[in-house]
C-alpha cells in the first residue's frame, strides 16, 4: 500500500476516535493537534522502520506480533483516556501515545488486507 493511503486511513481513524472521545471529555486544540501529528507519524512509522525497497520489506515491524503490541498499547492508553483528567498526570502524553498506536495499528490492518498480508 502507498504512503498516501496509509495517511488517509490513519487520519480517518483519528477523526472517529476524537469524535468518540469528545463525548467523554472535552477535546481542545491543545490535545487535538498533537494527537493528529501522532497519528500521522504512527501511520507511516512501519514504513520508516522497514523501508519498502523490496518485496521482502515486511519484517518484525510489519508482523502480527507488532499488531498485537499495538492493539494492547492502544487499548491500555485509550482506556486510561476515559478516566477523569485529574487522575492522569500526563493526559496529553497518554492521548498522544494512543493516537500514535492507533495510526500504527491501522497501518498494519491496511497491510493485512493486501495479498501478502502480515507475516507471523
Predicted feature locations:
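N-terminal membrane-targeting hydrophobic helices
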Residues: 1-120
